[in-house]
Each structure stands twice: as structure tokens, then as C-alpha cells.
């Protein structure tokens, strides 16, 4: 019997499993980063990143997204710089992103170094969905956060029907967001 006789494509199923494994691997890496931050003394806040839906962390008075911050090392901007305009500038302007770890145990080189990159990366590369002149309101920020969370839940859903429901809800939230923006 060939793959087309019974309507089941083994290669497509394998590819789907590969994609799911890669997504699971990324989730494990994100979880490991968050665990490391907690062990280093960072605090997980009740807020979530507008871009990826990951919980925001606070360390040394700065709030950041561990996932987007990690992506910043790949020259991608974060949404947290736009959702927190009252953030103070980095405490140590001399720090570089690839510096060696400090000798004091109470500071985190990955947290401090990547946080120093945030304003530079955000100024250099703005995401398409975040215009520079538009002020954000709590309603738009909440809708953006909800859209990101719904999209993440849809990608994590095992049941296609559940994923479709999450995506429909995200679509409705996006339509509401479009009506709020001028």
C-alpha cells in the first residue's frame, strides 16, 4: 500500500511531530531561563509581555521579558520597552552585552547585560505593529497582551477545535484593537 491509498501521509505526520518537538524544545528552554532568573533573585510579576505572552520579571528595579530579552541578543526589539515608558535607563552604561560574568554572586550578568541592550535594540529596530508616534492606552496594551496569550494558547492546544476557538477569540480581539487605534 502506498501513502495515498489510505489517505494518510506519513511524511506530513513526521513533519508535524518534528515541529511539535521543536516547539516543545523552545518551551523547555524558556522555562529553564525563567527558572534561572528565579534562582538569581528575580521576581515574576503578574504582568505578561505584549509580544509573546510570557510573564514579565523584575530584577534590580527593572522589568523585562525573559523571552523577548533573549531574542534581543538576536537583534529583535521587545514590546516591554513600549509598554513601560517610565523605565529608568540602565544603571551601568559601561556594561556590554557580552561581558564576562561578575564576581559578585548577587548580580546576574545575563540579566544586566541583556537589559542594557533593550533601549538600543528598541531604538534601532521597531516592530511593525508598534508605531513610534502613537501613545498606548491601558486598553490597547491589555488587548495586545490578550491577543498574544490567545495565540500562544492556540499554538499549545492539542485539539484543533480548541485551537480554532482561541484563534477566533484572538481575531476578535485584534478587530477590537484596530477600532481603538486612530
UniProtKB/Swiss-Prot annotation:
Residues 105-122 have a biased composition (Low complexity). It comes from the Archaea. Residues 1-162 are annotated as: Disordered. Residues 7-33, 47-62, 153-162 have a biased composition (Basic and acidic residues). Pfam families: Auto_anti-p27. HAMAP family: UPF0148 (MF_00343). Belongs to the UPF0148 family. This is UPF0148 protein VNG_2366C. It comes from Halobacterium salinarum (strain ATCC 700922 / JCM 11081 / NRC-1) (Halobacterium halobium).
Amino acid at each position: 500500500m502506498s501513502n495515498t491509498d489510505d489517505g494518510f501521509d506519513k511524511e506530513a505526520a513526521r513533519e508535524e511531530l518534528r515541529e511539535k518537538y521543536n516547539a516543545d524544545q523552545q518551551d523547555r528552554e524558556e522555562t529553564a531561563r525563567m527558572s534561572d532568573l528565579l534562582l538569581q533573585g528575580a521576581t515574576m510579576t503578574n504582568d505578561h509581555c505584549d509580544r509573546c505572552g510570557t510573564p514579565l520579571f523584575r530584577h534590580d528595579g527593572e522589568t523585562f521579558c525573559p523571552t523577548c530579552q533573549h531574542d534581543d541578543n538576536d537583534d529583535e526589539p521587545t514590546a516591554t520597552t513600549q509598554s513601560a515608558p517610565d523605565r529608568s535607563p540602565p544603571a551601568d552604561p559601561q556594561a556590554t552585552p557580552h561581558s564576562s560574568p561578575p564576581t559578585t554572586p548577587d548580580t546576574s550578568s545575563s540579566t544586566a547585560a541583556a537589559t542594557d541592550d533593550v533601549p538600543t535594540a528598541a531604538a534601532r529596530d521597531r516592530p511593525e505593529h508598534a508605531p513610534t508616534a502613537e501613545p498606548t492606552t491601558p486598553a490597547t496594551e491589555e488587548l495586545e497582551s490578550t491577543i498574544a496569550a490567545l495565540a500562544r494558547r492556540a499554538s499549545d492546544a492539542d485539539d484543533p477545535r480548541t485551537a480554532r476557538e482561541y484563534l477566533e477569540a484572538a481575531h476578535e480581539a485584534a478587530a477590537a484593537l484596530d477600532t481603538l487605534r486612530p
